[in-house]
Amino acid sequence: MLPTENRLRRREDFATAVRRGRRAGRPLLVVHLRSGATDPHAPGESAPPTRAGFVVSKAVGGAVVRNKVKRRLRHLMRDRVALLPPGSLVVVRALPGAGDADHAQLAQDLDAALQRLLGGGAR
């Protein structure tokens, strides 16, 4: 489970990540990343935590399928939060094919999207 301090909950935070962040699309999901704008040399300020949120619409499937996809994505992001810059906002939007995908396929798409957003992958 994703720790509480790493969860994105407010509508404004989702909107900021989607509108002002960078986007990487994959066959099963789209990842929006708004990098943290913190100054590492600012005195007395600790880095805010990276926060992640998930959007899984009814196009993915029924309630059981949507919740299964959200649980899988939360589990995958838990291990990847440390790789992102402090203070970042991440929104993972599941596409309709995510409901039929297994854990490994979701992990592969999430890793590829994050790698592209962090500058490690070619277009």
From Swiss-Prot:
Catalyzed reactions: Endonucleolytic cleavage of RNA, removing 5'-extranucleotides from tRNA precursor
Gene expressing this chain: rnpA
PANTHER family assigned: RIBONUCLEASE P PROTEIN COMPONENT
The protein's name: Ribonuclease P protein component
Any matching Pfam family: Ribonuclease_P
Source organism: Streptomyces avermitilis (strain ATCC 31267 / DSM 46492 / JCM 5070 / NBRC 14893 / NCIMB 12804 / NRRL 8165 / MA-4680)
Quaternary organization: Consists of a catalytic RNA component (M1 or rnpB) and a protein subunit.
Biological role stated in the UniProt entry: RNaseP catalyzes the removal of the 5'-leader sequence from pre-tRNA to produce the mature 5'-terminus. It can also cleave other RNA substrates such as 4.5S RNA. The protein component plays an auxiliary but essential role in vivo by binding to the 5'-leader sequence and broadening the substrate specificity of the ribozyme.
Family: Belongs to the RnpA family.
E.C. number: 3.1.26.5
